[in-house]
Amino acid sequence: MMSDYNWFEGIPFPAISYQREILEDIRNKFVVKEEDLLILTYPKSGTNWLNEIVCLIQTKGDPKWIQTVPIWDRSPWIETEIGYSAIINKEGPRLITSHLPIHLFSKSFFSSKAKAIYLMRNPRDILVSGYFFWGNTNLVKNPGSLGTYFEWFLQGNVLFGSWFEHVRGWLSMREWDNFLVLYYEDMKKDTKGTIKKICDFLGKNLGPDELDLVLKYSSFQAMKENNMSNYSLIKEDRVTNGLKLMRKGTTGDWKNHFTVAQAEAFDKVFQEKMAGFPPGMFPWE
């Protein structure tokens, strides 16, 4: 399994589109501008949904931008070759997406006033979503079974490393004024409330009609039908059975896939790894 990844500082990256030199540059040389907005997530946490919402907030609900420009051009992934190149050459405020753990992120961010949104999701759902997603790509070795992927996930031998370490790292910034923590589960339960929370954080005033447009065009169905957001433009050589980026978009799907023993094993690891956080920090627990 080890040879199927690009390893950097103990973190596994996909074997293509990720280079050691770029990852080093991001951490040590890349300068985050004060007007930049960062979308930070662990994979399969709802990154693209959050991106779509943020893009629509920027345009006050006008869908033209999201329907004409691919999502990876609107908010490039800084850790990819193409994304990094696009970001460093972009003038003005930048929307930047990243799955990087905190210790690999740009050092300049931590002394800047740039705003960042960190989106979290129940790691059990992330595990199941990741299993079905990565199995359809040629980016990593196919685990072959959920049981195998389950073990890899708990060990942190999956893309971008351990969920537990990723979350512990970024949550160390949760008290900072320029850092907003969101939960996928809250976004599903009260999407409009979450949109308002993001607007408040960004200092954007949207009227009721504009909020409704953001809600409408960021819906699961709207994104599924938008070729600029559903990743249908990805080259076929990267995927085996078509890239099912948007499989279900639900919460609690893990209950349909975990055995009782797996559920108990996961609970045990979660309690050990996430000890010390205040009660209520994780709404799914």
From Swiss-Prot:
Quickly give the catalysed reaction: an alcohol + 3'-phosphoadenylyl sulfate = an alkyl sulfate + adenosine 3',5'-bisphosphate + H(+)
Which GO CC annotations does the UniProt entry carry?
cytoplasm
Q: Does this entry carry the keyword Transferase?
A: yes
Compartments where found:
Cytoplasm
Q: MF terms per GO, please?
A: alcohol sulfotransferase activity; bile-salt sulfotransferase activity
Q: Which residues bind 3'-phosphoadenylyl sulfate?
A: 44-49, 121, 129, 184, 218, 223, 247-249
- Class of this enzyme: transferase
Pfam families in the record: Sulfotransfer_1
Q: Chief subcellular site?
A: cytoplasm
InterPro entries recorded: P-loop_NTPase, Sulfotransferase_dom
Q: Which UniProt keywords apply?
A: Cytoplasm, Lipid metabolism, Steroid metabolism, Transferase
Which example biological process does GO assign this protein? Answer: steroid metabolic process
Q: What does this protein do?
A: Sulfotransferase that utilizes 3'-phospho-5'-adenylyl sulfate (PAPS) as sulfonate donor to catalyze the sulfate conjugation of a potential wide variety of acceptor molecules bearing a hydroxyl group. Sulfonation increases the water solubility of most compounds, and therefore their renal excretion, but it can also result in bioactivation to form active metabolites.
Please name the PANTHER family in this protein's record: SULFOTRANSFERASE SULT (PTHR11783)
* Name this protein carries in UniProt: Sulfotransferase 2A2
Organism of provenance = Mus musculus (Mouse)
Lineage, uppermost ranks? Eukaryota, Metazoa, Chordata, Craniata, Vertebrata
